[in-house]
Amino acid sequence: MPVNDPVGDMLTRLRNASRARHDKVVIPHSKLKLEIIKVLKDEGYIGEFVVHEQTVQNKRTVFPEISVQLKYGPDRAPAITGIRRVSKPGLRRYAAAREIPQVLGGLGISILSTSRGIMVDSEARKQKVGGELLCTVY
């Protein structure tokens, strides 16, 4: 069954795997998803990630996937307590540099798609660039 919102699907997979205390989660590959995962790793919300290819048996089809290692605290509390899609396919949300909202008073991050690439809210404010609010993580 086709997915209408690939980024939303990725965020849901991360949220569900984190709440179920899984060690890793496998996500279908795309350039946008890979950039978001790089930002999550840089911010310390996830561990390592590996891009690999899965071949379907008896077919010559190859599907690239991203295997993400999830992070947990000392008491097995997930590093990602909340992850939410902001800009959706049915209602896109954009913000100028001075209008980018803070998440939980600065304790969380917003991930934006800007003209200079995918970045967190603090970096976008520093570079004075706005963009599409993809998601919030806390």
UniProtKB/Swiss-Prot annotation:
Protein origin, superkingdom: Bacteria
Protein name: Small ribosomal subunit protein uS8
GO molecular function annotations of the record: rRNA binding; structural constituent of ribosome
Gene label: rpsH
Subunit structure: Part of the 30S ribosomal subunit. Contacts proteins S5 and S12.
GO CC field: ribonucleoprotein complex; ribosome
PANTHER family: 40S RIBOSOMAL PROTEIN S15A (PTHR11758)
HAMAP family given in the database record: Ribosomal_uS8_B (MF_01302_B)
Similarity section: Belongs to the universal ribosomal protein uS8 family.
Protein role: One of the primary rRNA binding proteins, it binds directly to 16S rRNA central domain where it helps coordinate assembly of the platform of the 30S subunit.
Taxonomy of the source species: Bacteria, Pseudomonadati, Myxococcota, Myxococcia, Myxococcales
One of the GO BP terms on file: translation
Keywords: Ribonucleoprotein, Ribosomal protein, RNA-binding, rRNA-binding
